[in-house]
Amino acid sequence: MSKRKMITAALPYANGPVHIGHLAGVYIPADVYARFQRRMGKDVAFICGSDEHGIPITIRAKKEGVTPQDVVDKYHEIIKKSFEDLGISFDEYSRTTSKKHYEVSQEFFLKMYHNGDFIEEVSEQYFDEQAGEFLADRYIVGTCPKCSNDGAYGDQCEKCGSTLSPTELINPKSALSGNVPVLKETKNWYLPLNKYENFLTEWIIKGHKDDWKPNVYGQVKSWLNDGLKPRAMTRDLNWGVPVPLLNAEGKVLYVWFDAPIGYISFTQEWAEKNGKNWKDYWQNENCDLVHFIGKDNIVFHCIIFPSMMKAHGEYIMPQNVPAFEFLNLENDKISTSRNWAVWAHDYVADFPGQQDVLRYALLSSAPETKDNNFTWKDFQTKNNSELVGIFGNFINRVAVLIHKYYNGEIPQGTPSEEIKEISKTATEIREFLEKYEFRNALSSLMNLARFGNQYLQTEEPWKTIKDSPEKTAQSLYIGAQIAVALAQMCEPFMPFSSDKLLKMFNVEKLQWIDLEKETELVSAGHKINESSLLFSKIEDDVIEAQIQKLEQTKQNNKKTNPNANPMKEQINFDDFAKIDLRTATILEAEKVEKADKLLKFKVDTGVDIRTVVSGIAESFTPEECIGKQVMILLNLAPRKIRGIESQGMLLLTTKPDGKLSFVTPDDKIENGVEIG
């Protein structure tokens, strides 16, 4: 096994914050592995960064009326801070809009281009003549041919889940202008993945059947069995890394071409800052490359990126790609579009100082081989029963008793059979983590805390102190060894708690191999610091507040307009029948003196001509209103406004920008026509 470890975590997409699904399925396991490998004495480079190109970012930018750069700048900072707050120990966290990344991506493309690794193909793609640009799949909307959903995209119908191509849509329209797009020829550069089928079969199917996860191996095997096809490595877009060819204006590198190259460019940035040679981590067979990803990225990291590196010719292949399945939330699929998620930055704000509780809860439910579920009640139980009741309880008992009986000094004792439990646990954790079995590794850690509690219950040092003080000393000496072992071993999983414990017991961090030796970890006479509670109980009302937050999200998702106000008190039909709504035309309009918001109208209701005062002057000038056909509540009791008797109410609604809009008939009709 190599001394050097190149560990990457999938680049989070900078069109929104990270949530617990991302954390459980990629970033916390990757961090545990990186921290563990450092403790094993390995030369580790743990690399990640924000993926800042692609269609979803441009779509969000258009929706928000800002530039794509504005979008990625905002979310890059939110994501980066979330990782820092949760103790994700990246050696480098960069971004794909960096100058270095553009240079490295373009150099990579040119090397393959000059090697003759691409094929040029001309295809027909939808083009928006008004916007003057080719449309990516997500910029084409229409009716789904499978379920008749009118809001299907060019790549997928989110209602029925069908995968689509733009030409399958019924009545396709451009999401940019609303116009019907035309098919237009365009040239792009394709990577003939079929050329690498034999290489991928030899490397993965024959070479990694026994040591790669079944979900990863099975998905790769399925892709290869179906036969690989050429895939475009360039796109007709104006946001991304420009294709570095003279005849490629208006084209950028495919986001899944440039994004994985980010691992390389970010490593180069890190190496330059730290006096390292980046090639030692990417072009040296004595380095183990490991990609941590979610299952939706398997094809990119096990087929496309390895094919790119093979074509380039100078890069090592991954030793492993431990892809995780998905984490659900309260028995429902996490969805960013539906806001059905627990966002990392929200958790940090709502649970200050409790980062390790989330790390522990997510690791213990990590979706290693199948989808798993997170619930707030389970989160509470894991904290209260396991972290407080078992782990924290043992640590506290040992520290308090040592201070009470021995003035904070480790009492005299000798290593006994119980010490073997420490070395056994350290070995178990190492073996589990080397196989990417994070849940089992965490269970071993907690089992050592359980063992410590059982040991204290059996020895009862609080009772033996009077009659057998030497027995009390021995039991608390052993208790201290177990407590220090927990402080050392919990660091990859719960780094904040480990830091507190190492300070509490006044010890330095050890290499992992030292924990596997059957020797004492702290000597008699060693002075420990004052104890403090490691974890605190989470009360029901705190959890209920989080559940209610999700319930509110669920209610909002039932609305077609999440910003709509709740329905008012229900009325019966007789009440409705009393309302007299009519069509009417505004004949005259003028501002009301000394009233910035009021306009005075003379309105032809078909029944009569009357005066109406309305507070809409901030949305309309008087001139805009004259001649407009509107709808009026005719039988509303008159009331005086600024001394003017208003005889009715005009119907208006509020647009997304906050401006008012008249409710009007589709076509001009007679005044006085009843509505209802």
PLM ranges: what are they?
Residues 2-75, 92-110, 114, 131, ...:
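N-terminal catalytic cores of NTP/NDP-binding nucleotidyl/phosphoryl-transfer enzymes
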